[in-house]
UniProtKB/Swiss-Prot annotation:
Residues 249-255, 273-277 are annotated as: RNA binding. It comes from Thermoanaerobacter sp. (strain X514). Signal peptide: none annotated. Substrate binds at residues 94-98, 148, 191, 218. This is Queuine tRNA-ribosyltransferase. One of its GO terms (biological process) is queuosine biosynthetic process. PANTHER family: QUEUINE TRNA-RIBOSYLTRANSFERASE (PTHR46499:SF1). Catalyzes the base-exchange of a guanine (G) residue with the queuine precursor 7-aminomethyl-7-deazaguanine (PreQ1) at position 34 (anticodon wobble position) in tRNAs with GU(N) anticodons (tRNA-Asp, -Asn, -His and -Tyr). Catalysis occurs through a double-displacement mechanism. The nucleophile active site attacks the C1' of nucleotide 34 to detach the guanine base from the RNA, forming a covalent enzyme-RNA intermediate. The proton acceptor active site deprotonates the incoming PreQ1, allowing a nucleophilic attack on the C1' of the ribose to form the product. InterPro entries: ArchSynthase1/Queuine_TRR (IPR050076), TGT (IPR004803), TGT-like_sf (IPR036511), tRNA_ribo_trans-like (IPR002616). Its EC number is 2.4.2.29. It is an enzyme of class 2 (transferase).
Length: 375
């Protein structure tokens, strides 16, 4: 039996948006869905119970970081990642490809795999597609990723073509190495930079390999938004309708809406948790930097329209005070709010698809939030 099962429930009549159900070994997920990021087996500042309270059904964790610390063998001894971190809902792990790409000066790419130095202590390591599968098998996540090379932006055509070829070869090797297919679904990752022919070729060749789902990687790495949207549009066209599609590392409110319109089902991003720790929050009227002086005597909630724990109980003035005093609670309250905001946004998007009014929803949301409708 397959580890996951995707059911397409409804398609939007005027866009490529889809409403779906993704069944995993650790629960059923309504899509489109946003996945909070728990890089080191924790969503920063949140307990698993709090994540459940805000409606998170799946989180993301990171193969590269967990391999280096505490080590996948230790997590395996603990009974797997779910038990280790006390999270009984679904987990997706990424392959570490993006993290190694970020270490440009500390890595060497070969056909066999990638040699890199740990960002923690400088020790040498070697990742192959097989090794990455072995690590993720030990972690026991529900959805795992093929090892890929995330080409930088900008990069010339030849470099990206070679990088794409490598990603396809690695996907094949990873698929052969993956034995735990009944409990873990392996996704192929579509690369190809901003080159349409490469994206098309990569998608088609991965689809021939018949993965249970497909990721769109190598975007949101510095390219203009309209270019990213065009590539997503083009890529989803070549992906099967009966499999989930995951846009990696994308999670601002406008990107979530635009991604859904282009047929994406799953998203993840560190943005909501990272900006929360720096005192920036999402509101229905746009971003707000709560640590700024104007909020010193503002006793209204972060967002009048939000019913998260933070907004029901605390004022902007209080949260600003916590940030100014470097109190840990500041990051916790802002993180709870930001993740709740995005999870609620996805709920509203799903409802808009259900009612066939996603474009109207986008128009209203963008106008209120302060986005220009230029895409």
């Amino acid at each position: 039996m397959a580890a996951i099962k995707y059911r397409l429930i409804k398609k939007d009549s005027r866009t490529n948006a889809r409403l779906g159900i993704l069944e995993t070994p650790h629960g059923v997920i309504e899509t489109p869905v946003f996945m909070p990021v728990g890089t080191q087996a924790t969503v920063k500042a949140m307990t698993p119970e709090e994540l459940k309270e805000i409606g998170a059904t799946i989180i993301l964790s990171n193969t590269y970081h967990l391999y280096l610390r505490p080590g996948h063998k230790i997590i395996e001894k603990a009974g797997g990642l779910h038990r280790f971190m006390n999270w009984d809902r679904a987990i997706l792990t990424d392959s570490g490809g993006f993290q190694i790409f970020s270490l440009s000066s500390l890595r060497k790419i070969k056909e066999e795999g990638v040699e890199f130095r740990s960002h923690i202590d400088g020790s040498k390591h070697f990742f192959t597609p097989e090794k990455v599968i072995e690590i993720q098998n030990a972690l026991g996540s529900d959805i795992i990723m093929s090892f890929d090379e995330c080409a930088p932006y900008p990069a010339d055509y030849e470099y990206v073509k070679n990088s794409m070829e490598l990603t396809i070869k690695w996907a094949e090797r990873g698929k052969k190495a993956h034995k735990n297919t009944e409990k873990q679904a392996l996704f192929g990752i579509v690369q190809g930079g901003i080159y349409e022919d490469l994206r098309k070729e990569c998608a088609q060749r991965l689809v021939e390999m018949d993965f249970p789902g497909y990721s769109i990687g190598g975007l949101s790495v510095g390219e203009p938004k309209n270019v990213m949207y065009d590539i997503v549009d083009l890529t989803t066209e070549y992906l099967p309708e009966n499999k989930p599609r995951y846009l990696m590392g994308v999670g601002s409110p406008d990107d979530l809406i635009e991604g859904v319109i282009r047929g994406v089902d799953m998203f993840d991003c560190v943005l909501p948790t990272r900006i929360a720790r720096n005192g920036t929050v999402f509101t229905s009227k746009g971003k707000l930097i709560v640590r700024d002086a104007p909020y010193a005597e503002d006793f209204s909630p972060l967002d009048e329209e939000c019913d998260c724990y933070t907004c029901k109980n605390y004022s902007r003035a209080y949260i600003r005070h916590l940030f100014k005093a470097n109190e840990i609670l500041a990051a916790r309250l802002a993180t709870i709010h930001n993740l709740y905001f995005l999870i609620k946004l996805m709920e509203r998007i799903r409802e808009a698809i259900r009612q066939d009014r996603l474009l109207e929803f986008k128009k209203q949301f963008f106008k209120k939030y302060g986005y220009k409708e230029e895409y």
